[in-house]
């Protein structure tokens, strides 16, 4: 079987679709670094081309609804390697049939893309619920997260709508970037740090350094922990339900769990 290797970007995958039609091939798609199948022929290395990718996406816009395109975009934010082949197959089928196949739940590739999208949207909702801000002495609010999926672009509008009169930074410690908002700016700015070792907060638990943390915020954190413990009814503790509603992987950045 022919094998394509691409750079794990959406433009790279769309370029692979372009190449597969240009070369009349139905390849197995692998990300850079994945192991080649046994006895595989020399792989075709996809050179990401923005122009080719744009042509493929424009073609998708002619065949798919806006909602179907949104599902593709959101599913890609999962960053799951297992999605690469189903998404590649799905896009190829759209061009081969010339139809919108996005509602064909009996197609395994369509189903894989839709289910992946659901997982990403589920985590988007959890991020909105579980983000905890800390206030720095300069008045800026900081929240550190480390989601399984790359959901930061999906939640930024939510926080801009609610905190458009305050300065804040939401930082993804896993992907090493964040969004900073400072009124009266129209929109948050994506930022990265050249030296993460020098940032005034912990990437492990998200806590601001003591010399940066606002004095009143430390008080509010202590009050919140006290309240969290006080409302607990020991006879009704249900660890299984708590873990289902609030997975352990989010705890390290949550004030009430630190």
Question: Where are the regions a protein language model picked out?
Answer:
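N-terminal ordered "arm"
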Residues: 1-51
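Short, charged/polar micro-motifs that form catalytic or ligand-binding hotspots
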Residues: 3-8, 42, 46, 103-106, ...
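Short, hydrophobic/amphipathic alpha-helical patches that form generic packing surfaces
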Residues: 12-23, 89-96, 157, 161, ...
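Charged, alpha-helical interface segments at or near domain boundaries
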Residues: 31-128
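Short, intrinsically disordered, low-complexity segments enriched in Ser/Thr and Pro
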Residues: 42-56, 182-215
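Short coil/turn segments at secondary-structure boundaries
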Residues: 70-75, 173, 236-243
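Internal, well-folded beta-alpha domain core
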Residues: 100-201
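Long, compositionally biased intrinsically disordered terminal regions
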Residues: 167, 179, 194-258
